[in-house]
């Protein structure tokens, strides 16, 4: 592995702040936390930070691209822990092997970098579980600042979704979290609901928590529909194309969408799922077995193709399961809003995402398959409402969730 960027020493460093970031995923991997980490890290270089990232070999999907052990990517020094043939997330055994391999390799690699040069800040996200502990231990050992960014709150998310986790393990995980929160100078969360969970449920001091939401990934302009793409997807004139894109995992009640599609058989609507996750295979088998013709699936798409599909859709679906409203936040909503697409949220109306949509009049919220089917039938009768909500989504995005605005908040926090 090329370590040249880590062996230059500190000569001529001046007042540059040196940041060590640790996360299992990073660009070009398709995992959303890795993509956001890459945006943050490359954005911070324009504010005078020298950024070094310890990450894993791309592995989120079995189709993840190859990447070198070391590269300078958009001004960021990226060091990768090799994963061999451990790729994908469809079964827990593969996930666990990836977690262990990354944590072990990241610990060794981060310690080597910290011995080679002086860092000012360690920053970790939440992939994999316990990477925050790794960051906290290193920060204590080398007496430097530590910032923690949990995009999901674990193990609460897993417990809430019915995972059978031994009580002792949940207790140990809680002890680890308390240590991480104690060592962290700042904890960055995505929403007010997540902050309330940490303050009231985890006893994290409110003054330690910062709220910085997400932005569109990719961040788009409002663009006209691509008729060729609609033809390729076999969407007929007058049909609605409803898009679900992202993780098809345990956090998402996707059966509601499938059930609504089943009730809308023969109507002028198509549902397209793009992405991967633990539920994907099950959903595809259900659609096939029940002969639900207007539902189709695609794997993660290259960015350019995904953008073409997104701008050609009529509305986008965003989900989060009951009980998870204050533990996680589906990030795709911001990409959809940046493209000027109306949003249909399927979740508790008090979830942070549902509140964003309701308060800014850029979509609708439903909780059941009956409600979703009824809404779609109404939209088929009134397509003008789709365009109006889409324009409002774009306006809201520009006012509240632009990437440059939010990266600046990270720069101010870390200085």
Residue ranges and their predicted role:
Residues 2-77, 261:
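N-terminal subdomain of nucleotide-sugar transferases
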Residues 65-70, 221-235:
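A short helix/loop element that forms part of the nucleotide-sugar donor recognition site in Leloir-type
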Residues 130, 137-141, 168-187:
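Membrane-proximal helix-turn-helix segments that form the acceptor-binding/catalytic region
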Residues 188-189, 195-216:
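Helix-loop-beta element that forms the nucleotide-linked donor phosphate-binding surface
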Residues 236-252, 258-261, 272:
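Conserved donor-binding/catalytic core segment of Leloir-type glycosyltransferases
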Residues 252, 302-309, 316-337, 342-355:
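Nucleotide-sugar-dependent
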Residues 268, 272-275, 281-307:
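Nucleotide-activated donor-binding/catalytic signature segment of Leloir-type glycosyltransferases, i.e.
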Residues 378, 385-399:
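A short, well-ordered alpha-helix in the C-terminal region of glycosyltransferases
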């Amino acid at each position: 592995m090329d370590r040249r960027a880590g062996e230059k020493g500190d000569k001529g460093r001046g007042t540059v702040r040196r940041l060590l970031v640790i996360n299992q995923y990073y660009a070009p991997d398709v995992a959303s936390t890795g993509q956001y980490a890459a945006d943050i890290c490359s954005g911070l270089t324009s504010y005078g930070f020298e950024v070094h990232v310890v990450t894993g070999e791309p592995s989120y999907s079995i189709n993840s691209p190859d990447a070198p052990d070391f590269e300078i990517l958009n001004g960021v020094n990226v060091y990768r822990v090799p994963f061999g043939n451990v790729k994908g997330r469809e079964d827990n055994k593969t996930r666990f092997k990836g977690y262990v391999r990354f944590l072990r390799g990241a610990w060794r690699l981060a310690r080597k970098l910290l011995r080679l040069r002086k860092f000012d800040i360690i920053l970790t996200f939440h992939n994999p579980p316990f990477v925050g502990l790794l960051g906290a231990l290193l920060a204590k050992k080398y007496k430097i600042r530590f910032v923690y960014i949990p995009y999901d709150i674990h193990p609460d998310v897993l417990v809430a979704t019915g995972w059978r986790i031994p009580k002792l393990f949940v207790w140990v995980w809680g002890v680890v979290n308390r240590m991480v929160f104690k060592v962290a100078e700042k904890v960055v969360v995505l929403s007010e609901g997540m902050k309330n969970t940490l303050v009231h449920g985890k006893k994290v001091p409110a003054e330690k928590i910062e709220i910085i939401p997400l932005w569109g990934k990719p961040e788009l302009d409002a663009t006209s529909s691509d008729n060729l793409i609609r033809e390729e997807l076999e969407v007929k004139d007058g049909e609605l194309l409803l898009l679900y894109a992202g993780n098809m995992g345990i956090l998402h009640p996707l059966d509601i969408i499938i059930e609504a599609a089943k009730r809308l058989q023969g109507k002028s609507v198509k549902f397209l799922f793009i992405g991967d996750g633990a539920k994907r295979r099950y959903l595809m088998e259900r659609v096939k077995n029940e002969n639900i013709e207007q539902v189709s699936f695609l794997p993660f798409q290259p960015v350019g193709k995904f953008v073409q599909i997104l701008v050609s859709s009529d509305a986008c679906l965003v989900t989060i399961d009951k009980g998870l409203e204050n533990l996680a936040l589906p990030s795709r909503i911001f990409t959809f809003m940046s493209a000027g697409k109306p949003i249909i949220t399927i979740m508790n109306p008090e979830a942070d995402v549902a509140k964003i949509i309701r308060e800014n009049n850029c979509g609708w919220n439903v909780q059941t398959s009956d409600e979703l089917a009824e809404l779609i039938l109404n939209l088929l009768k009134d397509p003008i409402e789709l365009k109006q909500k889409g324009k409002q989504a774009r306006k809201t995005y520009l006012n509240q969730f632009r990437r440059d605005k939010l990266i600046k908040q990270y720069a101010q926090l870390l200085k």
